[in-house]
């Protein structure tokens, strides 16, 4: 199997792939969120003291929360890497619930990965292996298990509790599976063609 197999250039639809990736990114963000309801990745009793120092500049001492549940990766990324003063500041409220910048980041993160996946799939079809599960596993490995600890967004990999790995692995797999389902269905419906690596007229 040639993992670097490429599609015929005249069958590629980059603009359409990006458009579908935008849709898939928004929808799959809710899938990823939903996966964290029965399998929460972080606990309010696990502390992340290494990332708690800057909180004294944001909140009064009695309001500081050093738990992993509060100091989650999107929060720390916005605070430490983008310099957002308070990532929990409300973007809007709905039915009395606050939607903050951490939630916005979650959706943007999903859109970026979905667009990237859909565009790459136009050229390298093997990225779709196992209906997107390969891409989900790669995202888990390179983002959550390598990049996040190196960026200080999580504790070192071997300090993470087992339930966080279970939640994130499951979440990434169903996230990319949903992206692939949406990508394939919308692309095939809009173009009235199979994916570019499949010859036209094929029964596949």
Swiss-Prot record:
GO terms under biological process: response to acidic pH
Residues in the Cytoplasmic compartment per record: 36-100, 154-204
InterPro entries given in the database record: DUF1440
Source superkingdom: Bacteria
Subcellular location: Cell inner membrane
Disulfide bonds: none
Record protein name field: Inner membrane protein YagU
Gene (UniProt): yagU
